[in-house]
Amino acid sequence: MNTFTWNDMNSTAREYILMSKDVRDMQYRKQWPAPGDKTLIELVASENKALKFYLDLTENKRSSSLILGLSADRKSTMQTRVSDRPLIRLDYSDNLEVLRHRNPDGSLIVGTHVHFDLDGYGAKWACGIPGQNILKPKSYDFASLFWSFQETCNITDKLKVELSLGV
């Protein structure tokens, strides 16, 4: 596959992602999880309130070492799912070598990448940000990727997630 597009996605997953979603508890200020933690935000779609959507935010533990300064490799994940079915997931790292994913065809993706729900594979297939045209960040920094993810998943822009500097 050259460039992933909306048409490559499972049609039901695409329909779910494109549904307009709001925060179920109407609490729009959330905190990004601390290293080693996960935040689960329940979402509701106005088109079908029976569906249970979630935005999962995960901040992996960081391995820090003191070598003329502090070096902490950040690994974060944001995922939108319906019940227990992942629809789209973004795996982010500020160090290309820390984040690797092997696709079902054996190809290796290194660095920040996005998983899509594809027919026959679920969300096991990933590509780098430049290898798709679904998630369209203004830049590849963490904040821009998060806002683009939120927009792509059609999650209300009222939701504000505060990031900590976390070391």
List PLM regions with ranges.
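Aromatic- and glycine-enriched beta-alpha-beta binding-site module
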Residues: 46-100
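Intrinsically disordered, low-complexity regions enriched in Ser/Pro/Gly/Gln/His and often acidic
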Residues: 23-25, 118, 140
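A short, compositionally biased
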Residues: 34-38, 68-75, 110-112
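Charge-rich, low-complexity N-terminal segments
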Residues: 1-63
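Broad hydrophobic/π-residue packing in well-ordered secondary structure
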Residues: 2, 9, 70-76, 81, ...
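Generic secondary-structure transition motif, activating predominantly at the C-termini of alpha-helices
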Residues: 17, 21-27, 94, 150-157
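Acidic, proline/glycine-rich low-complexity IDRs
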Residues: 129-167
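An exposed acidic His-Trp-rich patch
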Residues: 77-134
